[in-house]
From Swiss-Prot:
Residues 130-225 form the Rhodanese domain. Gene3D superfamilies: 3.30.70.100, Rhodanese-like domain (3.40.250.10). InterPro entries: Rhodanese-like_dom, Rhodanese-like_dom_sf, Rhodanese_C, TrhO, TRHO_N. PANTHER family: THIOSULFATE SULFURTRANSFERASE/RHODANESE-LIKE DOMAIN-CONTAINING PROTEIN 2 (PTHR43268), THIOSULFATE SULFURTRANSFERASE_RHODANESE-LIKE DOMAIN-CONTAINING PROTEIN 2 (PTHR43268:SF6). Disulfide bonds: none annotated. CDD domains: RHOD_YceA. Belongs to the TrhO family. This is tRNA uridine(34) hydroxylase. Catalyzes oxygen-dependent 5-hydroxyuridine (ho5U) modification at position 34 in tRNAs. It holds the Pfam family UPF0176_N. Its EC number is 1.14.-.-.
Amino acid sequence: MAQSKILLYYKFTPIADPKAMMLWQRDMCELLGLKGRILISEHGINGTVGGDMDACKRYVRKMREYPGFRGTEFKWSDGGAEDFPKLSVKVRDEIVAFGAPGELKVDEKGVIGGGVHLKPEEVNKLVEERGDDVVFFDGRNAMEAQIGKFKNAVVPDVRTTHDFIRELESGKYDWMKDKPVVSYCTGGIRCEILSSLMKNRGFKEIYQIDGGIVRYGEKYGNDGLWEGSLYVFDRRMHMEFGNGVQDPGFIQLGHCVQCGAPTNKFEHCINEDECRELVLMCPDCYENPATRNCGREHCKEVAAEAAAAAAV
């Protein structure tokens, strides 16, 4: 049986004709039987694709034949094409939607004016040398931090990346402007842009983790500064490092919104026609229509009606 894998990658580099790049990517992935999501802009490319391992290897080789993508780093993860509903290749103004396409500047070396890149071991060294002065700043949506984050991290109140500029300009984080700030996100791409936005707004000492949380977790498992699970954007929805939740060093952060039981599984509220919330829910509460809700009053009412109908 053929082994399947998921590839995660991004590359900031000028792309003169994003539409032509989109057509090339779509045709190549269809030929190789890969599924996933690829976003392309004039600033670069951001992709997550899954499929047969041999097909993934051929994809990597083809990508590196293109001059602008030769230095692209590909991360391999467990999974395959079955983890994605389809192949989606699109052109956008931004490959990560911060709402500031005109502010981002890139050249052949990547983002201009971003934070200093640190390898995982350099992150630990910075904390050893600077202690509690170091601030970890979560560059993801706040929801993702419910199941995992760096120890004592600052988690901004954001639902989407579009909210970050408003948050940075709110004054809430001005106390961090003279401190060493380590921005972090899943694979590193969001912090490439976020660190640049922060520097443009007066944050003086900004760092980012090479390879993001994924690379740090691969290096240290549950024995470093990371706590809990990692939210991922495929059908798995979360992953763990080391030996997972059974690891003695694993710290459980996620808990069911209804009963408080430990869980890392996000589920849709029962009121899917009106509510788009993903909430942490244990299997028992998800199976019961009465508790399969996000906790908002109207959604509780919808859940109660569903439970009553099921009881008839």
